[in-house]
Amino acid sequence: MRVDAKNKRRSAVLHKKATTSFKLAVVVVTLQCLKGRRGNAGIFRIQNMKKQIKDYVVRSNERLSDSYSLLKLQPADGSAVIDTCAGQFVEVEVPDSKTTFLRRPISINFVDRDRNELWLLVRVAGEGTRHLVALAEGRVLSLVLPLGKGFSIPADTVSKVLLAGGGVGVAPMLYLGSELKKRGFEVAFLLGARSKGDLLELEEFEKIGCVYVSTDDGSMGEHGLITKNSALQKSWQMLYCCGPMPMMKAMAAYAMRNNIECEVSLENRMACGVGACLCCVEDTVEGNLCVCKEGPVFNIKRLKWQI
């Protein structure tokens, strides 16, 4: 009896420690981050970065369409926006919701260092995101950040890169395109949406590079799927992609046929954001990996896609 009681107390202590560690999400990771191509060769590299739980204030909430809002946030304590990599994401606590218990994973859309702002592009997909797009200026949000591994930089021999985004998959492409342009790459975007009204942040993308557009109804750009856009007839040396799974698989197949390096940002359903709940597992050549921790960005050669 005494031994059983001791074991129970020990189990309770271990459970409490594990739960506390998970809630704080303080996990030391080696993140792959962009370093300059025409400066320091390599990939995004920030060593020993810790995930943080930090309050951010909503500085503006711009409704871009019926389904999307752009939140621009600043650290509540006046500090600088934490270093992040294009392709990473944050977990946002949803305020004022009695039924949304889990944080919501949102891609980092852009980091404006001049204004010290972190941008999040939010698509209404359920009760949690409905609360987020309705937030007023001045509201405080609790974020866990930065999460996941972002995009890598192309080899020094690469000059022309294509960034393809469909639907909410355009979100990480703005930040990635901006970072690549700073490092001397020729950046172009291929953006797809159901209609003209669903095309997001076009003016921001046009500041960075050439923009090719496809809409399902032909209301803007080329009529049809992004995977049929004439931009794919041009010569590209690196492809980045994020969007619906059929689109990403089609773009991956295009890249393989043309011997182009390709990275995709997966949108598997997530919960914890730190690899604990195992609900975002993807089958890869290395076995089952948690997208939130080992991704969301993967080179297509690592994925067991039938393409």
Task: Name what the model sees in each region.
Residues 267-296:
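Local cysteine-cluster metal-coordination motifs and their immediate loop/turn environment
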Residues 5-8, 12, 16, 41:
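Short hydrophobic alpha-helical segments enriched in small aliphatic residues
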Residues 9, 24, 33:
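Cationic, low-complexity basic patches in intrinsically disordered or flexible, solvent-exposed regions
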Residues 50-139:
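Ferredoxin-reductase
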Residues 98-106, 148-155, 292:
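Short, Lys/Arg- and Gly-enriched loop/turn segments at beta-strand edges
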Residues 33-48:
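Short, Lys/Arg-enriched N-terminal segments with co-localized hydrophobic residues
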Residues 127-267:
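FNR/FR-type flavoprotein reductase catalytic core
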